[in-house]
Regions:
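N-terminal intrinsically disordered/low-complexity leader segments
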Residues: 1-9, 151, 196-199
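Generic hydrophobic, amphipathic alpha-helix propensity
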Residues: 10-19, 35, 60-64, 68, ...
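Helix-turn-helix
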Residues: 2, 13, 21-55, 59
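Amphipathic C-terminal alpha-helical segment
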Residues: 95, 113, 141, 161-179, ...
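Amphipathic alpha-helical packing segments from all-alpha helical-bundle domains
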Residues: 118-145, 156, 186
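Hydrophobic alpha-helical connector segments
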Residues: 59, 72-103, 154-161
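Amphipathic alpha-helical segments used for helix-helix packing
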Residues: 84-85, 98-122
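Hydrophobic alpha-helical segments that form the core
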Residues: 103, 109, 152-171, 183-191
Length: 199
């Protein structure tokens, strides 16, 4: 009998399934039996391929950032600060209301439910802080180009955009419809610094 049977699962597919469980349940709420069942593997195979639960969660977060939340990087490349905000909010709506996705934001949900893993919570908070820094730097560029009204703080604007994003995520988790969230986005855009509403 041959030794070393080949793995009978696709690690990418298994990681996608783990991502969905963490996204739906959060880190603390995702049990090992639920994870192994969703991934279609046993515990030894999970540990061999992905490490422990904490390491699996880190890999799932990376997959989330590169996949479903990949719209963030594209939004930051938009030509104007207002378009950056619009694309971030629209991306959040699209992701949160897609029937194929669990609602809400994995990183927000994960950072609020890491249980005893203080190290993991700090990593997620650091990830969110990095996102805020990138957004602030983008708005600083816009301010230097004369795109924002004088006196508008790039840091405050970044916090505002993220607060709306987080609100969209939480509202979607609470059952808000796509149409309702689109109205929230349009209302937020009307309050953009220097944006004049005509009609």
């Amino acid at each position: 009998m041959a030794k070393g049977r080949p793995r009978e699962f696709d690690p990418d597919v298994a990681l996608d399934q783990a991502l969905r469980v963490f996204w739906k349940r959060g880190y603390e709420g995702a049990s090992m039996p639920e994870l192994t069942r969703a991934m279609g593997i046993n515990r030894p195979s999970l540990y061999a391929a992905f490490g422990n639960k904490e390491e699996l969660f880190r890999k799932a977060v990376q997959r989330y950032v590169e996949g479903p939340a990949g719209y963030v990087g594209k939004a930051l490349a938009a030509p104007t600060a207002m378009e950056v905000a619009e694309k971030l909010w629209q991306g959040g709506i699209d992701m949160s209301t897609c029937p194929e996705n669990p609602s809400g934001c994995l990183i927000l949900r994960g950072s609020m439910g890491c249980g005893d893993s203080d190290r993991l919570r700090k990593e997620l908070v650091s990830l969110r802080a990095m996102g805020e820094r990138r957004l602030r730097e983008r708005f600083e560029q816009a301010a230097a180009a004369g795109e924002l009204p004088e006196g508008v703080s790039a840091a405050d604007l970044a916090r505002y955009v993220l607060a709306v994003m987080h609100g969209i995520s939480m509202a979607a988790t609470g059952g808000a419809t796509r149409e309702e969230l689109m109205r929230v986005k349009e209302l937020a855009l009307k309050g953009w610094p220097g944006h004049s509403v005509t009609g």
